[in-house]
């Protein structure tokens, strides 16, 4: 049997990286309910790594922040590109991603609520979360991540 792209996506979506990028997408899409729901799930079950091992939320903090940072960088590049050329497909290519239908759909949803000021707000919240952990010595990474979500909450 052959393994198709969708099969790979299905497996990846249940991996640690998949959950981390789902969290990042929720943050960038302004969906704080989904972001908090994912944190609750991760806190309870951990992130499942490729080998089946579960990674605790404490150990997953860096992975979650890295995924958010990576998606913020891509989204900012797309926003910047679209200022000059309003072609989403070309903007996605310029950001280093492949413009498949799911990617385009996700980015359209994201861009409907995420502008340059929201990107700046997320970057400031990433910095604050890192400061909470590394400088201020907060021990509860679940609390740090919840505060991160509240800081980037998109008000209607």
Which residue ranges define each predicted feature?
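Helix-rich C-terminal "collar"/helical-bundle subdomain used as an assembly and partner-interaction module
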Residues: 28, 32-156
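Long, charge-dense, solvent-exposed interaction surfaces that engage phosphate-rich ligands
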Residues: 1-22, 26-33, 44
